[in-house]
Structures are given as structure tokens and as C-alpha cells.
């Protein structure tokens, strides 16, 4: 929050009434005047925390560990010649810029949930992708995540972040999350419902957060949240884990939503205690075991997290779905074999797991657990496009995709060229790479910077042709080293 931002007096009065006895409203108001500390989360699908810390130190970044997320750090940049979002670490998917409190729901989920290679997880309100990518890293890119987003304008950003982070176990859907309980009852091993809310905890980063604040709007939002948590509960398997979270502070949107569910199904749910989630979690623990994060306690956003276990199954009347035609088919065995032979000969990679599907000339890799859901949902995007087919007969072949190399590139040692900082900048700016020794390279080549693959090129006589998708090109103000 900026110091000029005014907190409505009605809001201050309300917060005074619900503030725990050990906290002071003056401290709450004061912390709301201070800028929010920036934070990042290391993407362990691409780099270890230890190796990232070394890179950060070389950059002059000061990292302070976030207690509830082993991969999370508050970050201070001593010099900032370029935005953090244009750093090589961010562009290459090695880290995700994410507020510290928003790392809590996923940490809470995996405090109680141990995934398998067949686990199916729903992120009910997924955009822009911070929690979806965090879940994927915790699942080590295995199993299946349904990343649902109701806002059509945010689906593109969600996909861009999933692609940048090298994630291959996500299927994207575009529905009102209230449909999942009737459409897919008892389906998910775990569900994250980071519910839409009034955003009372976000005033430190959004000076407009309180412009439309009112008790009537809170009541209206809470009604939607009740419907969302009911749907999530029905979609959850018996013994499944549901995490309910918001970035707001009012009880109507937090504790009261959990009590609403408990009152509806007193014999079917159990509140799980989050006191042992991290050191000092008890400072924000409620009597029920929820975490109600006041911003002055950890110098963070305001937040709420509850962990709920479904202890007993219950029935729900299924709804009629209109799915439309599924646009993919399984390729022939010959084509599948030809594709994998191409990858083996060009990149010496043979450990590609998943189900191969085809749409026109495109070849896609789907996560194995998706199979029973293919006829149950309409997907906005499913799996990753790994190649495109071209030509006919002897002149036919395959072209790899940017998605393929972001997901598999760091596990490939063959046919890889290391770029300098200047060459990596040129690549992100969409330019071809010249003045590079590419002798011995033919056709497609992986391009890496500081040991991590950042994209794909094609070796020609005097240059490497850039294959970066147009929508990912950055024109200026990129990293210096």
C-alpha cells in the first residue's frame, strides 16, 4: 500500500473488532502503509535451491528464507538495471515471482498430501499460475493437475507461466468452478480452492484494493465462496485433502466458509491442524487449526488458509455436460515410432513418458492419468505440443517445439549449444544467432545459457535460426549478465 492510500474507517473498525488480542490495530495500519517485500520461489523442476542460491549471490541478490516454503525467498536487489521479470533466471523458468503468503496454500496441501504418479489434483482458480506451478514442482511433473480458470482473459497468462516453468502434467479448463462437484464427483485426490475474495490482504501491493470495499460486497462474495467450497467438497475423493484459502481477512470469507461446510456435512469432514506447518505458525493459528495471517505478523500480505479432509464419501446428483467433439486422435504406431526415433537420433533422448496424441499435423503428449477424464471434460489446453509433422513420403519429418525443449531440454546432453549473455539476449529478442561456432551441428539444436536450456534453434550455414515463439519475444531492457 502507498502511504497516500486511505483505509476506509468502516474497514478499520471491522478489523479492530476481529483482531486477536495480542495484536494492535496501530501496527496493522502501519504495516499497510509499507511496501510489500518482493519474493520469489525457486522452480526445482529446473534447478536446485542450492544452485539457485549460488546464481543469486553472483547477481548480488540478497535472499532471505521464507519459513513456510523451502523453495521460497524474500529477495532484495542491490542494483536493479533491469526488471526482475526480465532476468535470465525468470525468463528461463528457474524462478517464479510470487508473494510469500501465496506460497502457503500449496505448502499446506503437501503437508498432508503425498502424491503418486497417478494422483489427480484440481487447482480450481489457477491463474496466473503461481500455485499451479508450485503444485507441479511438488509433484515432480508427474500425475495430473487440472488447472481451471473462469476468466478467459487470464488463461493465456496461465499457459505462458506453465510453459516457461517447463511443466508437462497440466490440463487447462475454462469453467465456473461450481460445476466440478456435479460434473466430476469423487474424482480428485486433492483440491486447492484459492477462492475469489474481497482482497483485503492485498492493500500493500494494490493501492486500489479498498476502493470498492463494503460489507454488502463481502456478503455477496461469501455467498459465491459457499457454492465453490460445496462443489470442491463433492469433487473430492474420500480421504482427499481440500485446501481453502483467500487473500482477505474478514471472517465471513474465511472461517465462516469452513464452518458452513462443516455444518452441511458434520460427519464427512475433519479440520486439519496447521500449527506444525512451520516454525511460528502458532502465531496465526486459530482455535480450529486454520491460519489467519495478519500482515504485521510475518511482514507479508494478509491471508487465510484452512486444510480440510473428506473423511467419508457422499452422493451428489450428476449434471448433464455438453462436451463437444474431442479434436485429438491416437497416431499410428509407425508415426509414433518415427517421432521417438527422431528425438533419439537428434537429441539422444528416449525417456519420454506419456500418451501421444495427434491433432492435424501437431503431436501432443498427455499425462497418463488424463485418460479417464478425456470423455468427462472439455479442455482449453491439454498436455504439451512436442512436435509438428511436415511434408510427405521421403520428404516428411518432424519439427520440435519450444514446449518440448522447456520440458525436456535440461535432461538432454546431446546437440546443445551454450550461448553467451549477449547471444542469449539476442535469442530472447527474437534474433538469429550469428558469430557462433556451430560446426558439427545439423538441423535442430538446443540453446542453453549458463547450463540451462532456454529454447530451440536450427543450425544453418552461417547462423542459428531462432525458433522462439513470437509471443515470447522481449524487445528490450533484458538481463545484463
UniProtKB/Swiss-Prot annotation:
Its main location: cytoplasm. It catalyses: cytidine(1407) in 16S rRNA + S-adenosyl-L-methionine = 5-methylcytidine(1407) in 16S rRNA + S-adenosyl-L-homocysteine + H(+). GO terms for molecular function: RNA binding; rRNA (cytosine-C5-)-methyltransferase activity. The keyword 4Fe-4S does not apply. Keywords: Cytoplasm, Methyltransferase, RNA-binding, rRNA processing, S-adenosyl-L-methionine, Transferase. One of its GO terms (cellular component) is cytoplasm. It is found in: Cytoplasm. InterPro entries: Methyltr_RsmF_N (IPR031341), MeTrfase_RsmB-F_NOP2_cat (IPR049560), MeTrfase_RsmB-F_NOP2_dom (IPR001678), Nol1_Nop2_Fmu_2 (IPR027391), Nop2p (IPR011023), RCMT (IPR023267), rRNA_ssu_MeTfrase_F (IPR023545), RsmB/NOL1/NOP2-like_CS (IPR018314). The keyword Electron transport does not apply. S-adenosyl-L-methionine binds at residues 125-131, 149, 176, 194. It is an enzyme of class 2 (transferase). Its EC number is 2.1.1.178. It holds the Pfam family YebU_pre-PUA_dom. GO terms for biological process: rRNA base methylation. PANTHER family: 28S RRNA (CYTOSINE(4447)-C(5))-METHYLTRANSFERASE-RELATED (PTHR22807:SF30), NOP2 YEAST -RELATED NOL1/NOP2/FMU SUN DOMAIN-CONTAINING (PTHR22807). Specifically methylates the cytosine at position 1407 (m5C1407) of 16S rRNA. Belongs to the class I-like SAM-binding methyltransferase superfamily. RsmB/NOP family. This is Ribosomal RNA small subunit methyltransferase F. It comes from Psychromonas ingrahamii (strain DSM 17664 / CCUG 51855 / 37).
Amino acid at each position: 500500500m502507498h502511504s497516500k492510500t486511505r483505509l476506509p474507517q468502516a474497514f478499520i473498525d471491522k478489523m479492530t473488532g476481529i483482531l486477536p488480542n495480542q495484536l494492535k490495530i496501530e501496527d496493522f495500519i502501519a504495516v499497510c502503509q509499507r511496501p510489500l517485500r518482493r519474493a520469489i520461489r525457486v522452480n526445482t523442476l529446473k534447478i536446485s535451491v542450492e544452485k539457485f542460491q549460488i546464481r543469486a549471490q553472483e547477481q548480488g541478490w540478497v535472499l532471505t528464507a521464507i519459513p513456510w516454503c523451502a523453495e521460497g525467498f524474500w529477495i532484495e536487489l542491490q542494483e536493479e538495471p533491469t526488471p526482475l521479470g526480465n532476468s535470465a533466471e525468470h525468463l528461463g523458468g528457474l524462478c517464479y515471482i510470487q508473494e510469500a503468503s501465496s506460497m502457503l496454500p500449496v505448502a499446506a496441501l503437501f503437508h498432508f498430501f503425498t502424491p503418486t504418479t497417478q494422483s489427480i489434483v484440481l487447482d480450481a482458480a489457477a491463474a496466473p499460475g503461481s500455485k499451479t506451478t508450485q503444485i507441479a514442482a511438488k509433484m515432480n511433473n508427474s500425475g495430473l493437475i487440472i488447472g481451471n480458470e473462469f476468466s478467459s482473459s487470464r488463461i493465456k497468462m496461465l499457459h505462458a507461466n506453465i510453459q516457461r516453468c517447463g511443466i508437462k502434467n497440466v490440463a487447462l479448463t475454462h469453467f465456473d468452478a461450481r460445476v466440478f462437484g456435479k460434473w466430476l464427483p469423487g474424482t480428485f485426490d486433492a483440491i486447492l480452492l484459492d477462492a475469489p475474495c474481497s482482497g483485503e490482504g492485498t492493500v500493500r501491493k494494490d493501492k486500489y484494493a479498498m476502493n470498492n470495499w463494503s460489507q454488502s460486497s463481502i456478503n455477496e462474495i461469501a455467498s459465491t465462496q459457499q457454492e465453490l467450497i460445496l462443489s470442491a467438497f463433492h469433487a473430492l475423493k474420500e480421504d482427499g485433502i481440500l485446501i481453502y484459502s483467500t487473500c482477505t481477512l474478514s471472517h465471513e470469507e474465511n472461517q465462516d466458509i469452513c464452518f458452513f461446510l462443516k455444518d452441511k456435512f458434520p460427519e464427512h469432514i475433519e479440520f486439519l491442524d496447521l500449527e506444525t506447518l512451520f516454525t511460528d505458525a502458532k502465531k496465526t493459528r486459530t482455535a480450529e487449526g486454520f491460519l489467519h495471517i495478519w500482515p504485521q505478523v510475518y511482514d507479508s500480505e494478509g491471508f487465510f488458509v484452512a486444510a480440510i479432509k473428506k473423511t467419508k464419501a457422499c452422493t451428489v446428483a450428476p449434471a448433464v455436460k455438453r462436451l463437444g467433439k474431442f479434436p485429438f486422435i491416437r497416431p499410428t504406431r509407425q508415426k509414433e515410432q518415427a517421432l521417438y526415433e527422431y528425438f533419439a537420433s537428434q537429441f539422444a533422448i528416449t525417456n519420454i513418458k506419456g500418451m501421444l496424441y495427434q491433432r492435424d499435423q501437431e503431436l501432443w503428449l498427455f499425462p497418463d492419468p488424463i485418460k479417464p477424464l478425456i470423455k468427462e471434460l472439455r479442455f482449453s489446453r491439454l498436455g504439451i505440443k512436442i512436435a509438428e509433422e511436415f511434408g510427405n513420403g521421403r520428404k516428411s519429418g518432424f519439427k520440435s517445439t519450444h514446449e518440448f525443449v522447456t520440458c525436456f531440454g535440461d535432461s538432454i546432453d546431446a546437440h546443445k549449444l551454450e550461448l553467451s549473455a549477449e547471444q542469449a539476449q539476442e535469442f530472447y529478442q527474437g534474433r538469429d544467432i550469428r558469430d557462433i561456432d556451430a560446426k558439427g551441428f545439423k538441423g535442430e539444436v538446443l540453446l542453453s545459457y549458463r547450463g540451462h536450456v532456454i529454447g530451440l534453434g536450427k543450425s544453418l550455414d552461417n547462423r542459428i535460426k531462432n525458433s522462439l515463439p513470437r509471443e515470447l519475444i522481449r524487445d528490450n531492457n533484458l538481463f545484463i549478465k
